[in-house]
Regions:
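Residue-level recognition of the GNAT/N-acetyltransferase active site
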Residues: 1-3, 80, 116, 137, ...
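Long, low-complexity ectodomains and other extracytoplasmic segments of secretory-pathway proteins
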Residues: 6, 17-69, 137-187
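Short, conserved beta-strand segments of beta-strand-rich sandwich/propeller modules, principally
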Residues: 8-12, 58, 108, 128-132, ...
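Short, well-ordered beta-strand segments
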Residues: 29, 41-43, 71-81, 85, ...
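Short glycine/proline/serine/threonine-rich loop/turn segments at secondary-structure transition edges
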Residues: 2-11, 117-130
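Intrinsically disordered, low-complexity Pro/Gly/Ser/Thr-rich segments with frequent PxxP/GP/PP motifs
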Residues: 1-3, 90-119, 196
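Surface-exposed loop/turn positions
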Residues: 53-55, 103-106, 127, 173
């Protein structure tokens, strides 16, 4: 019933067969009658942010407890990237953060992420890893999620990997020097070479 008391119950029931006298199974169950949670992030869908290499980037989002009860929320972050990250929140244990939220309360969930250097063209411009923040309710264990992508800004860079020995050129004459030039940025690049 809708007005049932919040409680934990243990029950068992037996399964018997009319056609097989040997079939007699007993099943035990734990029943938890709990209040309904209603956690909502302030953003829907997947967000995308442009980031620069080698910058510690902060990302924050608001979350609201729209339920009628205090909710002790546990936050976790999931990503397939190897980028370093951590919580910008007061209550942290291991890789999780915690907030106790009164009904109709709004809180800020904040993390930092260390964006790595662009190395040998990776990560490419306008690409990057996805991060997902999970908020688990203490009321009914429901999970609310918000995902965001960190997309790398353009980085133009080049290296001279190999060059022949120095070349002296007399006035009114020409010569050639071979050089191996490599684009190590994360976007197409036009290289200009200046001789001195």
């Amino acid at each position: 019933p809708a007005n049932a008391d919040f409680q934990n119950l243990s029950t068992t029931f037996s399964i018997l067969s009319d056609t097989d006298a040997d079939l007699n199974e007993t099943v035990s169950m734990e029943i938890h009658i709990v209040p309904h949670s209603n956690l909502n992030f302030g953003v829907e869908g997947v967000s995308a942010f442009t980031v620069d290499e080698m910058v510690r980037t902060s990302v924050a989002v608001n979350i609201t407890n729209n339920a009628s009860y205090v909710d002790n929320v546990v936050f976790s972050l999931h990503t397939n990237s190897g980028w370093g990250w951590g919580w910008n929140m007061p209550s942290i244990s291991g890789n999780e953060a915690y907030i106790s939220m009164e009904p109709d309360a709004l809180a800020i969930v904040s993390i930092w992420i260390d964006v790595p250097a662009v190395v040998d063209g990776a990560p490419l411009a306008n690409t990057g890893p996805r991060f997902q923040i999970d908020a688990v309710s203490s009321l009914d264990k429901a999970v609310s999620t918000w995902s965001f992508d960190l997309q790398m800004n353009e980085k133009k860079n080049a290296t001279i990997d190999d060059i022949e020995a120095s070349l002296s050129v007399a006035p009114n004459s020409d010569g050639r020097v071979s050089a191996l030039v490599r684009n190590v940025g994360n976007t197409p690049n036009t290289l200009n070479i200046t001789l001195q």
